[in-house]
Design a protein with these regions (language model features):
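Basic/aromatic-enriched alpha-helical hairpins
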Residues: 2-66, 85
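N-terminal DNA-binding recognition helix of tyrosine site-specific recombinases/integrases
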Residues: 36-40, 49, 65-99
Length: 99
């Protein structure tokens, strides 16, 4: 069962909204970033608790070791940060300075 307040669900809802607005390319990039992070975490239901400085550092290292370019890594990190910040705004995730 999908957690309605989890990180993955928050990302999916935002991706749906982007598609409804006709922002298909942006939705595609968010979907790729979310999918990649889900694979890294080993679950399609990533929780906000799994988003830590250490997990993001390891994820960046994982992407680099798998041949992704720095531009792609930076883009994916921005997408993840954006999803996390939406969770903070909705009250589903704690604010963590310099996450």
């Amino acid at each position: 069962m999908t957690n309605k307040k989890g990180f993955s669900r928050c990302g999916e809802l935002y991706i749906d909204r982007l598609r409804e607005e006709g922002r298909y390319s942006t939705a595609h990039v968010y979907k790729n970033a979310l999918f990649s992070f889900s694979v890294f975490c080993g679950t399609c239901n990533v929780s906000f608790r799994q988003i830590t400085r250490e997990s993001l550092r390891l994820y960046g290292q994982y992407l680099y070791e798998n041949g992704l370019k720095l531009n792609t890594i930076s883009t994916y990190m921005r997408m993840l940060r954006s999803i996390y910040n939406r969770g903070v705004e909705a009250g589903n995730a704690p604010f963590v300075p310099r996450l």
